[in-house]
Structures are given as C-alpha cells and as structure tokens.
Amino acid sequence: GATAMAEAAVLAAKTSGRSRLLLARSIHPEYRRVVKTYAWANGYDCIEIPYGASGQVDGEALRGILDKTAAAVCVQSPNFFGVIEDVKPLADLVHGQQSLLVAGFTDATSLGILKSAGDAGADFIVGEGQGFGNPMNYGGPYLGILASTDAFLRKIPGRLVGATVDREGARGYVLTLQTREQHIRREKATSNICSNEALCMLAAAVYLASLGKNLKKLAALNVWKANYLKNRLTALPGWKPLFAGPVYNEFALACPDAGAANARLGAAGYVGGYDLSKDYPELGGGILLCATEMLRKEDMDCVADLLK
C-alpha cells in the first residue's frame, strides 16, 4: 500500500513536470515515510498538510499551500486515525490548480460501503489489499493496490491484464501495454518495481468471490462494532474522542494513560491500541483502537470493563 502511494505520487510528478508533493499528515506515518524516500530519490519536495479538529484534511491549510507547483495531493480515507474524508471537495480544490489527487485507504474492506474515490474525482486510488483474505504475517507479503483513470494507463507501473474474446467466442486474457515495462524499456521504464504478488492477489480474488455482495454487510459490521466500542469507552472517566469526524473501524481517543491501558489489556489476552504520541507528539496521551468484524460483542464489553 505504501509503495503504491509512492509510485502514484512520483508518476504524478513525472507526468506534470512539477516538483512538489503535498501529503496529508493524517496519512499512515509509514506511507508518508515511503513517499518521502521516493521523493528524495527523484528530487521532489514533500510538504505536509495539517489535519483539523475533525481529523480530516484541513481544507483552509491546503488552500494556503496548494498552487501550480504542486504535482499531486495525497490523502487517505479512511485515514490513519480511522476518520473518513470527504474526497469530492478535495478533488475539486486540487483540480482547480491542475494538480492530481492520489486517494488512499487504510482498510480495503471500507470500499464495500464508502463511495468510490474515483467517483469523487481522484486521479489515482491506492491502498493495502491485505484485508481481502490475506492473513497478518509480520509485515508481508501483502497486496498493494493501484488504480488510475484511463489517462494514465500507459504510465502506471506493474503488469496490466487485458481481456478479449477469441474467434470461437471464448474469453481470453493477455498481458497488455507491455511497452511500459522493464523487460522492454529497460532504464526508461515507468517504474522498476517488479515484485510478483500473484498469490496474494489470488487469495483476494477468492475472498471477494466468496463474499460477493456481502462485502457491504461486512463493511457495515465494521462501522457498527467500531462505534459500539468507541461509545463504551468514551463513557469511561477520562476517555474522549480526539476527533469529531466519522470513523470506519479505527478511532482515536484521549485516555488517562495509554501505556497502563495497554498493559491491562495485554494481561487479559487482548492486543491493546497504538500509542499515537510515537508519531504524533501533539497527540500525547492519545490511543488508536480498532474493532473489526472479527471482534465479538462480549470481547468489546470485556475490554470496556477492564479499562474502568
């Protein structure tokens, strides 16, 4: 997912001939680090866009730094705080400066219920597909997803598979637009990325085929469970939401002591939340928690009782 965002950002810069990349500070910190590494290697500047009280991109701050030197604006929805962005006004603002919008997501299952960033005007959609049937595995291998509008089909990295019908009426598949790739263009290729994630892709395809339209139900379950746990915890003394924006399956809370809370949960066999002060010093005392379809209601009640 992080690599997909970096590839899209650099592609936008190369296509536009501009040298600045604007990154929402609400993007996953590791994604931002990877984008900055790619940008440094290619001679581009990265500027961070602050978040507002909602946890979403601060629109006024973006207006203040967005101009015609910006190649792309990168955002994430749901973002690192679990907050859902309103992508359409961001796309309109970005396109007003003839810049490109790279819209990411933290959890692919959110696509089952949220409006497509493409329909909202994003030029690139990037993210992590691990949530589609691929187990957690100490950091990988995972499944990066990168999609674009038709205007960039001949420039995006990776392999493209085309479908057609042969003269006997049977559907056939073939690798297409290969003149973009390393084995033909060598050092002039769009990208030198060449890892093969076919196994992860196959697992995702089987998972999605099995779920079918129930992906929407799964996504709705994530929303319900996250908000149930959020409401249980914010009823406790000293616990309150850090942001006012709507959330998917993650949420950020202020709490009396994140370390003590995690220690108590760990002793009871639960994996605690993420201490936000590690990457966001201004959110010292903040904790990022998650509740997915895998978490039972009795577990959420137990967590709330443990933290009383």
Residue positions per predicted region:
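Conserved PLP-enzyme active-site core in the AAT-like
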Residues: 3-172, 238, 253-255, 259-265, ...
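Conserved C-terminal alpha-helix-loop-beta "cap" of PLP-dependent enzymes
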Residues: 211-302
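Glycine- and acidic
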Residues: 17-22, 47, 71-76, 186, ...
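C-terminal alpha-helix
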Residues: 306-307
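Active-site C-terminal subdomain of aminotransferase-like
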Residues: 132-237, 241-244
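Electropositive phosphate-/nucleotide-binding environments in soluble metabolic enzymes
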Residues: 2, 29, 56, 84, ...
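Pocket-edge structural micro-motifs
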Residues: 25, 177-179, 274, 291
